[in-house]
Amino acid sequence: MSSSTPIPTDLLVPTAKGLYCERGGFFIDPRRPVARAITTHAHTDHAPPGCDQYVCTPRTADLIRSRYGPEQNCLTLEWGTQHQFGEVMVSVHPAGHIMGSAQIRIEALDGGPVWVVTGDCKDDDDPTTEAFESVPCDVLIIESTFGLPIYHWPEPETVLSQINDWWATNAAQERTSVVMTYAVGKAQRLLAGLDPNIGPIGIHGALVGPTEVYRAACIELPETIRAGRDTATELQGRGIIVCPPSAAGTPWIRRFSGKDGMETAFASGWMAVRGRQRWRGVDRGFILSDHADWNGLLNICLLYTSPSPRDTG
């Protein structure tokens, strides 16, 4: 680029497929399959199946392969190490959302503003993921899933204690406990806080692969068993079962009822909204999120060096 050519100020532009960097030849967290996807984390709404290449952290690559198959083409980047794509340099930095989740830092080779895309993020303490790291930048694109003042999370340890108390009460009455939550990240955060002294812990098949990846990364989790026909008797009454929301009301879940039936719960930040528990049709709602709440988002913005924030909703 000649010295008379203006330096582009918009390294990233929104398109139908997602945020696109023309100078780097990649999308960030595309909505549909693309040739090269720089992927902040392994949730399917950020890492759609079918991309020719995923550029991500090693732990995100492990999670993607556990979900989509070992043949997935993943180019892995270590924390803070710069990699050139076309006319830009890219590096990844911990986002605190789930294990391996990354913020994406982008800088043009010929100068101009530094951009950071947080992806989903949080700044809470979480033993199952790398701690959030602030990255100096000029333009900050930050997620805002819970970007309203109504969203305030209780301390995660308080919520996990409530879940254990609920489970123990149910077990004493020979009533099976079922907690629905998302299979990657949230489920492992929940598992890390469960007390195995109360009873056996069963997990849905969709959680088995991701949970094994977490264990391989030396994340401390209690012993679990795969919840199925062969383990139903062991789990009935005393056990707790962690499963995705798609298992609600299925014959699979009904087989685990104890002598006094079962109680169901949903663990999510959305449980902070009145009516969500009824909408989900569960007995209990526990406010446990892998996203920053309103104050968390404000705190994250304040950590940056005078950025120009852009809200991704």
Question: Can you say where each PLM-predicted feature lies in the sequence?
Answer:
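A short, acidic, amphipathic alpha-helical segment used as a generic capping/interface helix at domain edges
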Residues: I163, A248-F256, S289-L303
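Short internal beta-strands
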Residues: Q53-R59, P200-G209, R310
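His/Asp/Glu-rich metal-coordinating catalytic cores
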Residues: T5-R32, R36, A42-M180, G185
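Structural motif
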Residues: R31, T181-Y182, V242-A248, A267-W270, ...
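Conserved small/polar residues in nucleotide/adenosyl-binding loops
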Residues: Y304-D311
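A contiguous, basic/glycine-rich beta-loop/short-helix subdomain that forms a polymer-engagement track
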Residues: E212-T264
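Hard-cation-handling environments
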Residues: I163-S177, T181-Q188, A192-L235
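A C-terminal functional module that forms or caps the active site or interfaces directly
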Residues: F266-W294
